[in-house]
Each structure stands twice: as C-alpha cells, then as structure tokens.
Amino acid sequence: MATKSSTSQAVSKLRQPIVCVLGHVDHGKTTLLDLIRGTSVASKEPGGITQRIAATTVDISRILKETEKLNTKGLKIPGLLFIDTPGHVAFSNMRARGGALADLAILVIDINEGIMPQTVESIDILKKFKTPFIIAANKIDLIPFFTDVKTNLFTEFIRKQRQEYVNELDNRIYSIMNKLYEFGLNSDRFDRISDFTKTIAIVPVSAKKNIGVPEILMVLAGLAQRFLEREIEYRDINGHATIIEVRKEESAGITLDAVLYQGTISVGDSIAVNTKNGPAVTKVKALFVNTGKGQRALKEVKKVSAAEGIRVLISDKIDVISGSPMIVVRDNLDQVMKEIEEESKVDIPLSEEGIYVKAEAIGSLEAISYELNKQGIKIKQAQVGDITKRDIMDVSTLPDPINRIIVGFNVSVLPEARDAMSSSDVSIVTGDIIYKIVEDTQKVMDERKKMLLQGRKMSMPVPSRIRILPQYIFRASKPVIVGVRVETGQIKVGDNLIRGDGKYAGTIKSIRNEDVSVRYQDAPAEVAVAIDNVTLNRQIFPDDVLYVDITENVVKELRRAPMEKEIMDTLEEIIRIKRKDNPFWGTRV
C-alpha cells in the first residue's frame, strides 16, 4: 500500500478517517456500503426519500465490537466516516486542498469477473491522488464448492471450507494480484502481508452473505492509525469542508450536504463557497448531523467538529457548485476567498479546436475530461452545469463539424437547449458512466467523420482505381457494360475515367450493385458499370486498370484535407500518370 505519509509520533487527538468506496458497476459497491452502514445505523425506515446526510460514521465502539475476535483493542481513532455515495466519480468530486477528500478507499472487485473498465478508471484516480486503498474481493459466495458458514469473519469462514474451495479462491486472488502488478501495484491477501506500506491488502468478502466486513473495518482502522496519523490529526481551526450535494428545499431554502474534514463550524458562522458566479460569502442559519437512528433521522446542533457529515442551511439563495470547498471565515476573508478560488480551478488541458464538456461538479468534469483526452479527443471548453441553449448556439458555430459535440456527464439537457437542437447539427452525448460516455463520444465523432468524408467524396471526383473483370463482359459498346472490381476510393455516376497511359477511357453512365442501381460505390466491391463514349477492345480492354480522372483542384483539396490512405496512394498513382505528359502537373496547387 502506498501511503500519503507515515509517522510514529504520538498524536493527542485524531479525527475520523474519511473512506470512499470505488469499483466497477455491479461489482457490489452499494451492497457492501449498505452492509458497512448497517453496522452503525440501528434501524432503517422503509419508503420515502432519505433525509440522511450522505456520510455515515462507524464509531470506534462498533468497530471494536465487530472486530473483538481480531485483536484490535489498541485502536485510538474515534471511528471511520464513510461517504455514502460510492464510485470513482463521487471520489473525484470530493476534494480537499487540492487532493482527495478521502483518506482511504475501498476498491470493490468482483472476484469472479476481475478487473473491469471502471476498476481501471478507479485505480488511475487513486494513483493520481496518492490515496491509500484496500481491495474488497467481493462475491466469494459464488465461487465453486462454497459452503455456507454462520460467521461474519472471513478468517473463521475460510477455516471451514473444503480444500477445493480454498484452491479456487486462491486462484482468483492470484489472478487479481497479477493484473494489479501490471499497474505497478503489489498486492496480497490481507492475512499474508507483513508490510502494509508496500503491499495492497485484498480482503475476500461476500456482501450478500455478510462475510468479511469485520476484516475490512480492522484493516482500514489499522492502516489509518498506523500510517496516517499526521493526516488525521485533529486541528482546532476554522472549518474546512467539501460540499457533496446542493439541495433547494421549498420550505427551508438552500441546504448544503458536506463533509467537514478539518476544524469546526457553528451556527452563525460566515462561510465562503464557490458559486456559478464565483466565490461568495453566506451565513450558517442552521446545522444538522445524522443521529444514527434511521434513514430519516437528523439532529439539529449548534456546533460540529471534524470529521463529520453535515447539512448546512444557508442564509442566501446562491448557485453553489457541488464538489466545491466550503470554508469558515474568521478574520481572514481575503485569504479564504483566494483559497476558494484556487481550490475551484479546473485543471483541464484545453485546445483551440475540440468538443464542449459539461459536468455536475469540478471533480467529475476533470475525471471525464481526463478520460476523453486519453483517447485523443480534444476539448475546447469544459464547464460545470447543465447543458444550455447558449452551449448549443456556441457549439453550432464551431468551424469543424466533427467537433460540434457536447458531452454531458451527470447533467441535464435544459428544455430550451433541446428546442435549439432541432435547428442545429449539434450532437449531445450524456450519461453517468465514464467509459460508456467516452465510447459513445468516439462513435459519434467517427460517424461525423464518416458523414463529412462522404459529403466531400460526393462533391468532387475521388482518386479511385477499378479493374475490368474479363469474365463479366456484358456489352462491347453504346454503352460498354462490364463487371469491375472497385479497388480503391469511390466511383460515381458521371466520373470520367483514364487509362494507365493517361488517355480518356469513357464516362461512367450507371452503376449496379447486384440488382440495385446506385449513384456511387465505395471500395472494395465488385459491381457492373455502363461506360459511355468508348468501345471495348478499342479504347479500353478486358483486364484494363482504369482510374477516375481528377483535376489539379482536387489535388489541392486533398493535400489540404487528406482522405483515407488508399485514396491518397491512388492520388499519387494518378499524379505519376499525368506527369508523363506534363512534368509539372499537380505542382502549382
């Protein structure tokens, strides 16, 4: 495990380490998180919209109770604070002073499926933020030879399994270890590790059967206390928090769900936040925390200390940006406003030409932009917020039609934007899974390139080569009708043809592909063509190779904006043919 830092220095007071859960879709993130939350939430009220703040504390008394058979009596941390929203997008959105809000992470991997696309995205993000993490190898109950055992401890469970099951489990763990090694990560099963600073712990679990959660809590708590004491040392300073969600309550006003990761916050405090119009200051009208007594249970308080999930009712109606910082202002307004501005900067490389990207928060904007850039997709503009009519209007005027695309990640397309789309050629790609959005964006770009290329091909003669098939001679004159193989490019009705010596070889009158008459035909294909103004065995012959005739203007256009390699190679063949009569043909363009 790569830690942020390590220290043996004794610390007088520690705050709760903050934990985020990541992993591929359907690998069990939410189920595992619910199971962990179940160790701290006494009861859950069915139905209705949850009124809980999206962060759950598992206090030290519960951790000690869950892990009492695992020798964890020396723990000094007050508990673990789990971010309730799983996924690498949530992780990316939760920042703290330029780094990740989470002190630790759980990467959930389906032990039977192994590492998948979103697993890779999660690993990339964890490495980027240098966040220590453990692996929950989930769904061990689906491994062959599984025997159900009445225990929630993996260490007890594994001792009661058949050897065939143990072998199957080890094979799957070794497979994950080998794959992780390709990413430069050393890993092993948690109970086989001697140095946790160098090796990532893999904890086999079954979220469905409630196996392995005590070991998850034990490893997380132990790692935090042993290697992250400096990071989780409590400091009595003005409060620093990260906003998870912005809510507009009709009766109350605007509330901010946030994770307070350092210092304190009180009712009446002035707080600085980032809005769509830049940094702003507002006041705390009320503070709420979870009570731990159910999904709908909130408790109003006057003051909160880190680390804790909080709900803040603010005094002003301002457009606060989710994922942005929230800092308590004492006598340091200028410094805090500068800090808000710095932490809210978007770190995305932009290009003179490219697509537009919109996302719900700064972190997700950076996450989707990073993946798009990795695939060579250039970005001209990246902003937080829903897709608006102004976005449609701006993108519709981009000079390159291929870039007239707006990618929306976890955002809505406003009604006025949908109306504007009907009269524009702008494409919108939206979704909530990064790798799927990237795939869809690439498909849209490829389709746009194809359509643009087809439009160009239809507007001018395309350098093409065809070969007459001697076994398919249907008529010798008026017009010649023969079967041909289109070897490169695209032939069209009306194209003039030349021979290999540059002499005129007729004009294409019609094209038939099987029993269908077509206006054009792309290579490779075999079709029948009718050729006007020539006679077979006089101007053209069976086995002849013919070319579509082009002008010097076509050479100029293709050198400015090339087509496929086969077409460009055929262009060079035609230039060589033309230069037999005119050595300077195609040079004055």
UniProtKB/Swiss-Prot annotation:
SS bond list: none
PROSITE patterns referenced in this protein's UniProt entry, alphabetically: G_TR_2 (PS51722)
A GO term for molecular function: translation initiation factor activity
Region described as G4: 138-141
Region (G3): 84-87
Key words of the record: GTP-binding, Initiation factor, Nucleotide-binding, Protein biosynthesis
Positions of the UniProt region annotated as G5: 206-208
Pfam family name, one: GTP_EFTU_D4
Domain of life where this protein originates: Archaea
Gene Ontology cellular component terms for the protein in this record: cytoplasm
Ranges for region G2: 48-52
Coiled-coil residue spans: none
Binding site for GTP: 23-30, 84-88, 138-141
tr-type G domain span: 14-229
Protein's UniProt keywords contain Transport: no
Region: G1, residue numbers: 23-30
SUPFAM superfamilies according to UniProt: Initiation factor IF2/eIF5b, domain 3, P-loop containing nucleoside triphosphate hydrolases, Translation proteins
Annotated HAMAP family: IF_2_A (MF_00100_A)
NCBIfam families for the chain: aIF-2 (TIGR00491), PRK04004.1 (NF003078), small_GTP (TIGR00231)
Family: Belongs to the TRAFAC class translation factor GTPase superfamily. Classic translation factor GTPase family. IF-2 subfamily.
Function: Function in general translation initiation by promoting the binding of the formylmethionine-tRNA to ribosomes. Seems to function along with eIF-2.
The name this protein goes by in its record: Probable translation initiation factor IF-2
Encoding gene per record: infB
